[in-house]
Amino acid sequence: MAKGVFITATNTDIGKTYITALIVKKLREANINCGYYKAVLSGAEIINNNIVAGDAKYVYNVANIKGNPNKCVSYIFEQPVSPHLAAKLNNVHISMDKIVDDFNYICNEHDYITVEGSGGIVCPIYYDKEKIMLTDIIKKLKIPIILVSSSGLGSINGTILTLEYIKKHNITVNSIILNNYDKNNIIHIDNRIILEEMTNLPVYICEQYSKDIDIPLKELKQFYDFI
């Protein structure tokens, strides 16, 4: 039976893909069969007239995963907009059943699954007669969250508000990772201390341009839960 975790963030462009890639890389370098999955990707790359899931390609490259990265993303859109708007622009119906089926397929191929979200935690995935929010997917997959946040000014507010929203939806958060952390920045240092005290969660850091995630392997594995 596979174990999974969901990587989400306090906002878009916080560094989910970067952190996800480092996590998958760390597990795979420890000879752990870890895979990657993303339900919906917008803002895809066009290479040689072919659409490419850029986030997935990045994770594959960093973590040295072989194969076609498009196969680990259920829906891929070219427009760099919210998933629900991308689906509307392309007249595509996003199906929860397909997401679950694709996720289960990845699970059958791996022992650990790292799932990357889209945007921040409050992200409409499909918004028509049927409505799917990102939190609906997380609850359907029944896996806990690692929350990625910024390290700088405003991090406390954004992190606490995100955690309150997650708590409202009865989803477990295992840890927080502060991205682009500067060990010499007094704001970053204080944010980490305050967030640990306010949330009672372990708060890890990832310095800019890091090639490894600063989380002990034993602790990282504990954040994954059985699916």
Curated annotation (Swiss-Prot):
Main enzyme class: ligase
Q: Which reaction does it catalyse?
A: (7R,8S)-7,8-diammoniononanoate + CO2 + ATP = (4R,5S)-dethiobiotin + ADP + phosphate + 3 H(+)
Q: Where are the transmembrane segments?
A: none
Q: Which Gene3D superfamilies match?
A: P-loop containing nucleotide triphosphate hydrolases
Needed co-factor(s): Mg(2+)
- In which pathway does this enzyme or protein participate? Cofactor biosynthesis; biotin biosynthesis; biotin from 7,8-diaminononanoate: step 1/2
Give the residues the record marks as binding ATP: D13, I14, G15, K16, T17, Y18, D55, E116, G117, S118, G119, N179, N180
Residues at the catalytic site: K38
One Pfam family of this chain? AAA_26
- This entry's Enzyme Commission designation comes to 6.3.3.3
Question: Can you supply a Gene Ontology BP term from the record?
Answer: biotin biosynthetic process
Residues annotated to bind substrate: S42
- Residues bound to Mg(2+) are T17, D55, E116
Which keywords are on file for this protein?
A: ATP-binding, Biotin biosynthesis, Cytoplasm, Ligase, Magnesium, Metal-binding, Nucleotide-binding
**Annotated compartments:** Cytoplasm
Identify the GO cellular component terms for this protein.
Answer: cytosol
Output the Gene Ontology terms for molecular function: ATP binding; dethiobiotin synthase activity; magnesium ion binding
Describe the function of this protein: Catalyzes a mechanistically unusual reaction, the ATP-dependent insertion of CO2 between the N7 and N8 nitrogen atoms of 7,8-diaminopelargonic acid (DAPA, also called 7,8-diammoniononanoate) to form a ureido ring.
What protein family is recorded?
Answer: Belongs to the dethiobiotin synthetase family.
In terms of PANTHER family, this protein maps to:
ATP-DEPENDENT DETHIOBIOTIN SYNTHETASE BIOD 2, DETHIOBIOTIN SYNTHETASE
Subunit structure, interactors included: Homodimer.
The protein here is known as ATP-dependent dethiobiotin synthetase BioD
Q: Which organism is it from?
A: Clostridium botulinum (strain Alaska E43 / Type E3)
Gene designation: bioD
